[in-house]
From Swiss-Prot:
MF terms (GO), sorted A to Z: DNA binding; protein heterodimerization activity; structural constituent of chromatin
Self-association and partners: The nucleosome is a histone octamer containing two molecules each of H2A, H2B, H3 and H4 assembled in one H3-H4 heterotetramer and two H2A-H2B heterodimers. The octamer wraps approximately 147 bp of DNA.
CDD domains, alphabetized: HFD_H2A
Name of this protein: Probable histone H2A variant 1
Stated role: Variant histones H2A are synthesized throughout the cell cycle and are very different from classical S-phase regulated H2A. May replace conventional H2A in a subset of nucleosomes. Nucleosomes wrap and compact DNA into chromatin, limiting DNA accessibility to the cellular machineries which require DNA as a template. Histones thereby play a central role in transcription regulation, DNA repair, DNA replication and chromosomal stability. DNA accessibility is regulated via a complex set of post-translational modifications of histones, also called histone code, and nucleosome remodeling.
Xref: PANTHER family: HISTONE H2A (PTHR23430)
GO biological process: heterochromatin formation
SUPFAM superfamilies (UniProt xref): Histone-fold
Bias type Low complexity, positions: 9-18
Main location, first listed in the record: nucleus
Top-level lineage group: Eukaryota
Amino acid sequence: MAGKGGKGLLAAKTTAAKSADKDKDKKKAPVSRSSRAGLQFPVGRIHRQLKSRASAHGRVGATAAVYSAAILEYLTAEVLELAGNASKDLKVKRITPRHLQLAIRGDEELDTLIKGTIAGGGVIPHIHKSLINKTSKE
């Protein structure tokens, strides 16, 4: 009892099914989580590292990795900017551990965050106030 309408619907379904199959063949290009978040640091790698080191038996949320990558990227950019300024002040084109040391110790917040020793960084020049204007009594 299929009339004209039945054949038309069946034909429409088959053409729609064919176009759906073509759409399935055209896969979207994979987009990394770093590019989705607008970051340069690898979110997937940081997520894997967090899972391997977490005391929660590998249970780390997806946004935790994105947030951690954003923090690391921001801190790296901040340190590199300050170290680049230090190397530019010394008229050198290459950033050395000395420039990193000057940049970190020159910024109060970074100094409190990074309290460790930087290999090859040298020392920060400092003369105590009592030694600057020492007058001899004669």
